[in-house]
Amino acid sequence: MSLVSQNSRRRRRRVAKATAHNSSWGEMQAPNAPGLPADVPGSDVPQGPSDSQILQGLCASEGPSTSVLPTSAEGPSTFVPPTISEASSASGQPTISEGPGTSVLPTPSEGLSTSGPPTISKGLCTSVTLAASEGRNTSRPPTSSEEPSTSVPPTASEVPSTSLPPTPGEGTSTSVPPTAYEGPSTSVVPTPDEGPSTSVLPTPGEGPGTSVPLAATEGLSTSVQATPDEGPSTSVPPTATEGLSTPVPPTRDEGPSTSVPATPGEGPSTSVLPAASDGQSISLVPTRGKGSSTSVPPTATEGLSTSVQPTAGEGSSTSVPPTPGGGLSTSVPPTATEELSTSVPPTPGEGPSTSVLPIPGEGLSTSVPPTASDGSDTSVPPTPGEGASTLVQPTAPDGPGSSVLPNPGEGPSTLFSSSASVDRNPSKCSLVLPSPRVTKASVDSDSEGPKGAEGPIEFEVLRDCESPNSISIMGLNTSRVAITLKPQDPMEQNVAELLQFLLVKDQSKYPIRESEMREYIVKEYRNQFPEILRRAAAHLECIFRFELRELDPEAHTYILLNKLGPVPFEGLEESPNGPKMGLLMMILGQIFLNGNQAKEAEIWEMLWRMGVQRERRLSIFGNPKRLLSVEFVWQRYLDYRPVTDCKPVEYEFFWGPRSHLETTKMKILKFMAKIYNKDPMDWPEKYNEALEEDAARAFAEGWQALPHFRRPFFEEAAAEVPSPDSEVSSYSSKYAPHSWPESRLESKARKLVQLFLLMDSTKLPIPKKGILYYIGRECSKVFPDLLNRAARTLNHVYGTELVVLDPRNHSYTLYNRREMEETEEIVDSPNRPGNNFLMQVLSFIFIMGNHARESAVWAFLRGLGVQAGRKHVITCRYLSQRYIDSLRVPDSDPVQYEFVWGPRARLETSKMKALRYVARIHRKEPQDWPQQYREAMEDEANRADVGHRQIFVHNFR
């Protein structure tokens, strides 16, 4: 006999048994059976087909309910709920072709299934599952003479129906709803391989119903729970590994329902939680196996639904949380590697919904965030999963939903969105990134990235319609808190552009015009210039500690004031514009001492006495005429005005608005006192004026404990700066330092300053004899005093140091410490950089052992392309500038000389700089010359121990 004939006979025999058994049920459950109480419907019992409790579980569509779950190659399942009239109908004769609900589940490990919510809230429709022991799904569609398996739900007034599944691998099952409120249940246990075991629900007050499972390995145990307010119902599942357990919980809220699932079974387990408002339902789903687990939580507002998903299977796990209430729905997903976890959070409620997705799973993960206004939803994704992920985003207007996608898997990721008809719907778009590293913007500390994940990585970008500038990016490998990126507002972008322009423009020290600032603002936002300027000023003050001050209200010019604090005063040579600022302070002091105004001729006369001539260009600050009449005036340090009623036209200098903001009269007066070696109170009138100005400033600033600090160019000298006279007070002279008149001393000192400035461009040392020849031999009596006055002026005004180059010959030179420390390569003539071989010669001498024969240096210069006659000129110039010194080689015949570093070379450069210079030429590292490198390191340590050189000269005779 063929296999088809055997299956047909078995189906006919099972249908006959089910028909006979259903007939006995009809006799036992007559509506007017004696000995039973009258049918009094409770408050929670549906009253008719149109009752809200029945309509509560229905979807929008009205067609028959058909849920066919796909195999691994078919795609997602389709679920069509029934209409109200069809869901509440009952059939007396259980044929295979009558029920409106048909659900064919796939076998384990063949695919994934996603099922929507139940169609009827009070009735139970139990689906039919193919046997798990048969491996892959071998189900076939019905032929023309056959009908699909049917599940007939109860009517509105009936209790939940009972599903009679077939034995494993034999066919489909038929669920026939019982009539209402009949006698106690009777459980008939069939023999092995014959049929299912059915437990019929007892009436109220009759006690609990007990279901004894099958003893065979292929039997089925079905438990129908007790009715309202009665004792608990206990369902003992089959011990076989292939049976199906379907617990149906009570419909009232007082009695808790406990369902103990099959432990080793492979079939699906379906748990329908109570629909009442106050009851608690705990559903323990199979811990092992390959079937699917479906948990339908209560629909009331206060019920607690806890669903523990399978821990080791390959099937799907579906958790449907409560829909309207404020209860808490917690879904713990399976930990298997290939299962599907679907979490549907509460829709309108206020309670939080937490969905923990599978951790190592390879299957599809579906998360439906809440749509309620007050509830929050937190979804934690799987970390190493290899399967596809499904995310359903919230659509409610007020409810915050934080949903995070799972890790990238091997399969594609599918994005679903819930279809709620509300005003604020976040728009979603899929962004494919080339590399998984891009998604590591926000990763939880406990999560790990995918190991060996391939394929594109996806982000979901949510843009709020009401706030278009707010974009939420929720990507893979993130948790709990999603990344929220806010694109730059156009106003903030204009503020950033203006801020950058102000910082760059301030470096030139020129006033910033309003018209220039408007050019960096987009035309559409120029009418909001005051607000943009206010925001930029706030950023400058909070971040960069600059104060934006309006310089001239009529011209609409602005400047930046530094508020970082005072910088210790160590001479203006430490500032980038030290010589220029020193000259400016001299001019401001002259204007202040002359009655707050000074004619141009008087200023130039004062500068000429200081060694600065109008038409002579100096290497320190360039063209003096342009510096005064153009640069200082443009920077608004000075005001340059013509004198009225004067022919020919003359001009006067005044303090500019920037000078009033960045310095004070008291600071300028103290500066002039240092220059002239006096006390500020030696000018009593000016001293009182400076005190009045300080008092007015303090009153205007509200007696602030921390006054506004300005740029360090005008910071007064610190008290700890030693007086120059104290360092040279031990000079030996038979004349007192102030035996000459003060005016004559000042005149000689200014002449000495002029000499040093003129000789500085030649890099030649200035001997004492040459100085006395220039200023007069009679000055030898007061030479130390004159030299100290000149050194003080050169330091404070021009930012240079007067140092003793050779104590034996009493030669002097100017030294700019800041410039030399920052300069890596020195030159012997700034005006002829192409003809300088100074660093080459010094490096050659150092590499040769700190001394080199004259013939070797000349050969080295010939190798650099120097002509035969030029080598003598170069070495003679270096000798005269004291960059190198010549020493006679002892016992040499004929007499020979060797070159060593001179005092100027040791002053302006170091051995480490020379070694780095050689390394750059030969494309090596300084460590490639280990002996010279150690010597250079020792030289650097010695220089650090000595510290700063004394800026004032001494050792005078």
Swiss-Prot record:
Residues 491-690, 745-936 form the MAGE domain. It comes from Homo sapiens (Human). Disulfide bonds: none annotated. It holds the Pfam family MAGE. The keyword Protease does not apply. Residues 743-957 are annotated as: Interaction with DTNA. This is Melanoma-associated antigen E1. One of its GO terms (biological process) is negative regulation of transcription by RNA polymerase II. Residues 138-162 have a biased composition (Low complexity). InterPro entries: MAGE (IPR037445), MAGE_WH1 (IPR041898), MAGE_WH2 (IPR041899), MHD_dom (IPR002190).
